[in-house]
């Protein structure tokens, strides 16, 4: 249609209606001015003048012009239809993109929330728990070391006390043996008994509970008359009593040592079991920390990916809006141009059907 119009306009370029003719009213001249702003309107008037001046029939001209106007209206309807289709596509695309953007924003928010409020606190908690486990392990080993040192010290004390008790018992046995073989001991034998008592006293100087027995025996041996059989029996009884006390004491410290050894062994087992549990807990905690670290890295990668996806979607939405805005501008300009041409064509059609137009054509023919 437009190609034909361009060719026709070129052909009719030299043809122009004399709008200054006295035939035309001021209203006609105003209409001419509006029509000449339109290519189609100007074309119709010039074509009509040419058609009539060459003997054409007005009704045929009207039919052709109406057909031309109808074609323009059909083309305008096509423009409306295509733009409506473009609008539907635009609305669907915008709705889709906005929904995807909303979904991505929700995913991005959830990823940030998961990272900030779950993974970070969880990682800090795991690190604190691992530190506590390491402190527990250090305390466990320190306790075991202290218990081992204390056990060694206690055992050394026990062995020393056993030696002391055995030395004292041996000295008592020697005194008893000596006292049992004499009827009237000499001064040398008494001195020997007293020497053994001094030895006993020295052996048992750390054991206050025996000091009174030793002290009494020393006093007896100093003051007693060993020739007196009654006094001698009292001395022997005292020695025997001391020996019994020493044997009981030795048995007790031996039993205490056995109990302490058992307690120590049980403590060692318990501490080692606890240490093994701590070590297993450390392995588990390290695995949890590694998993948390991996999850943090994956979540940060996801956040970066979601940011990129969101930027892409926003770019697509902006591009679609820009493209639709351009299409709308083209549509509005096209519709305005079609409306201008159709209105001008209708005005031209109305004007050429005025009797004055035919009079003008006749006047032009006479003038020719």
Swiss-Prot record:
The UniProt record lists the keyword Signal: yes
Compartment(s) of residence: Trichocyst
Coiled-coil regions, chain positions: 56-153, 257-354
Main location: other
Function description: Structural protein that crystallize inside the trichocyst matrix.
GO cellular component: trichocyst
Protein's recorded name: Trichocyst matrix protein T1-F
Keywords annotated in UniProt: Coiled coil, Signal
Prodomain residues: 17-55, 190-225
Residues spanning the signal sequence: 1-16
Family named by the database record: Belongs to the TMP family.
Organism of this sequence: Paramecium tetraurelia
Keyword Zinc-finger on entry: no
